[in-house]
């Protein structure tokens, strides 16, 4: 009787572990594909920055500190190898996410400062790069959201019964995802404006009101 119960228990366990196995395979492939697209779009952004920086340097009085921060942020972001294995390492993923968020912030500041330089904003090369950057940032947002959804689906499968038994048997574990506290910053593309009118100096509005 005990032997029969053992056999039934093992058979039941094997049957349950079969539940969700195909789902794991499918969602894992979805994660890899969406991660690849995230990396591609971040790389595209990084490739645009050298030309953007060189164009901005043509503006003799442009704030050097703003440019330096963009250059340093790009260097930090591109120094992290975004390998397929990175999405299985929470610490490495967090480091990658933070570096990309810092680059987004540096680019946003550069675009904000450029509003004060009408000659730069009238430069066709700069305007073209702005448009390319805006398009890339939008594609980053789309790719990141797909990754977030894929990881959420995968992690739910890892944690819920009976697929959690399959996860234990085959070693499937939670994968890191973009943190909620960074999501707003990451998803906010640098502001792009093609209005060539110079920015109003501080105090102008109050002076006009007097």
Spans of model-derived segments:
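A helix-centric hydrophobic-segment signal that preferentially recognizes long
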Residues: 2-210
């Amino acid at each position: 009787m005990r032997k029969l119960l053992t056999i039934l228990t093992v058979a039941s366990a094997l049957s349950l572990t079969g539940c969700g196995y195909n789902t794991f395979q499918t969602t894992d492939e979805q994660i890899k594909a969406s991660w690849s697209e995230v990396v591609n779009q971040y790389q595209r952004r990084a490739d645009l920055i050298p030309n953007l920086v060189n164009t901005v340097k043509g503006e003799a009085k442009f704030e050097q500190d703003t440019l330096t921060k963009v250059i340093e942020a790009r260097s930090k972001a591109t120094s992290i190898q975004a390998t397929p294995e990175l999405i299985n390492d929470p610490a490495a993923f967090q480091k990658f996410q933070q570096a990309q968020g810092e680059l987004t912030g540096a680019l946003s500041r550069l675009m904000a400062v450029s509003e004060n330089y009408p000659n730069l904003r009238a430069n066709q090369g700069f305007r073209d790069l702005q448009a390319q950057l805006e398009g890339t940032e939008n594609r980053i947002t789309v790719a990141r959201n797909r990754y977030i959804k894929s990881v959420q689906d995968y992690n739910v499968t890892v944690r819920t019964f009976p697929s959690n038994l399959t996860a234990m048997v085959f070693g499937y574990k939670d994968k890191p995802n973009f943190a909620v506290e960074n999501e707003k910053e990451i998803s906010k593309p640098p502001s792009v404006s093609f209005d060539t009118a110079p920015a109003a100096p501080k105090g102008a509005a109050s002076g006009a009101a007097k």
